[in-house]
Design a protein with these regions (language model features):
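Expand to "…catalyze enediolate/carbanion chemistry for C-C bond making/breaking, isomerization
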Residues: 1-279
């Protein structure tokens, strides 16, 4: 996997509400996504775009800041993309909602140049095309959008994380094959309760890199779920050191604690260290 922004806990904030947006930008989330889509009424789209552009320019760079634009099929998308293109390196990425095809991302990339993208997959067609979507240029992550996808599938909002396993696995495998991040979408509730924590621990155990949250009080639990334990980090460092020592000695194989170390073990160790910002 390439060197990507850490996204254990990603807080989404309405782009039309300056107070909430500023609170999000002052939070300890790994990334803040300022939303121009679902959280903004049609009459407020232009004002929200101007506000978000100003907030991104004024951000101090201490955390990743991305923007969720309106869907490409809407009358606001072109202006959203143009505004994001003007933000340049102060913007971490653009989240493209309702991504259904590789072409959707290519069209977005053509409009914004070098700005990185994230694909929010929230339709059955998007799930069907997840492999092609994940291979798009300039793409850092794919995200599952449960609310819209669940509605399209006729799935109950009370469905447990386990009921989404087939889709979660498809997104995860596609992301890993493309060398990008798999991010779990928001839990459909704002409480930091047992149900939310279970949803985070479930996708963390599957192998996802992080989770969107819709309330600041969920940040700590989400970050904790996607942060390796100290013991896991120590073991990963020992694995990497053992492999480096074996290579320096010209040995074809490495051992640690009586176990042979292969490339699969090395990949897992590097992923653990990447999750804590290590090398």
């Amino acid at each position: 996997m390439q060197n990507l922004t850490r996204r254990r806990a990603v807080l989404v904030a309405p782009g039309s509400d300056e107070r909430k947006a500023l609170k999000a930008l002052q939070s300890n989330a790994d990334e803040v996504v300022l939303d121009l889509e679902d959280a903004v009424a049609p009459a407020k789209k232009a004002a929200a775009r101007d506000l978000v552009s100003r907030l991104v320019r004024e951000s101090d760079g201490s955390r990743a800041v991305s923007v969720r634009i309106n869907a490409l099929t809407t009358p606001w998308a072109a202006d959203d993309l143009a505004a994001c293109a003007e933000l340049g390196p102060s913007l971490t990425s653009i989240v493209v909602p309702k991504t259904e095809t590789h072409k959707d991302l290519q069209d977005a990339a053509d409009a914004v140049g070098t700005v990185r993208l994230q694909a929010l997959v929230e339709t059955p067609r998007g799930v069907q095309n997840i492999d092609a979507i994940s291979r798009a240029d300039h793409l850092d992550a794919v995200i599952i959008g449960y609310a819209d996808l669940g509605a399209a599938l006729g799935r109950s909002r009370a469905a447990r994380p386990e009921h989404w396993l087939a889709i979660q696995e498809a997104v995860l495998v596609a992301a890993r094959a493309a060398g990008i991040q798999a991010i779990d979408g928001p839990f459909l509730g704002i409480a930091d309760d047992d149900a939310f924590r279970h949803s985070a621990s479930w996708t963390s155990a599957l192998g996802f890199d992080g989770k969107w949250v819709i309330h600041p009080n969920q940040i700590s639990s989400a970050a904790a779920a996607f942060t390796p334990s100290n013991a896991d980090v120590d073991n990963a460092r020992r694995v990497i050191d053992a492999l480096a020592d074996a290579e320096a000695a010209g040995n074809g194989a490495a051992q640690l604690d009586g176990q042979m170390l292969d490339e699969a073990v090395a990949v897992a160790a590097r992923r653990v260290l990447a999750q804590v910002g290590g090398q």
